């Protein structure tokens, strides 16, 4: 099952330490990260930053911006340590570079939870054809 999870996430191009990121999203939202967020809107998934469609899509935009600031990290291969304590994500990583990655993933998971009211099922699988490029800075 774990192998299937990893393959599914890699196929849709989610950035971040995929196992940890997926767990965080599931813990914060109760939603399956692959089916709910991996191809959502114009910013969730492998393409570059585009003009966000709504607050949920903006979460992915900000996540990409957060990852852009990381140095010497491989968001697909690197993993970090975190825990779920009292319904909160706690980044426990001692390596500063990996702790930053954890904080980026924590922020997007919390952002998804806080913006569940903006989630539009019609954007769940967006082909990105009509997404507009943005000059909006990170």
Swiss-Prot record:
Molecular functions (GO terms): calcium ion binding; calcium-dependent phospholipase A2 activity; phospholipid binding; toxin activity
Cellular component per GO, a single term: extracellular region
Segments for region (Important for membrane-damaging activities in eukaryotes and bacteria): 121-133
Family note: Belongs to the phospholipase A2 family. Group II subfamily. K49 sub-subfamily.
Subunit relationships: Monomer.
Superkingdom in the source lineage: Eukaryota
CDD domains named among the record's database cross-references: PLA2c (cd00125)
Localisation: Secreted
Protein name: Basic phospholipase A2 homolog Tbo-K49
Protein role: Snake venom phospholipase A2 homolog that lacks catalytic activity. It induces local edema. Is myotoxic. A model of myotoxic mechanism has been proposed: an apo Lys49-PLA2 is activated by the entrance of a hydrophobic molecule (e.g. fatty acid) at the hydrophobic channel of the protein leading to a reorientation of a monomer.
Bridged cysteine pairs (disulfide): 42-131, 44-60, 59-111, 65-138, 66-104, 91-102
InterPro entries given in the database record: PLipase_A2, PLipase_A2_Asp_AS, PLipase_A2_dom, PLipase_A2_dom_sf, PLipase_A2_His_AS
GO BP terms, alphabetized: arachidonate secretion; lipid catabolic process; phospholipid metabolic process
Record-annotated site: Important residue of the cationic membrane-docking site (MDoS): 121, 124
SMART domains: PA2c (SM00085)
Site (Hydrophobic membrane-disruption site (MDiS)): 130
Keywords assigned: Disulfide bond, Myotoxin, Secreted, Signal, Toxin
Record keyword Disulfide bond present: yes
Tissue specificity remark: Expressed by the venom gland.
Signal sequence extent: 1-16
Site feature: Cationic membrane-docking site (MDoS): 128, 133
Taxonomic source organism: Craspedocephalus borneensis
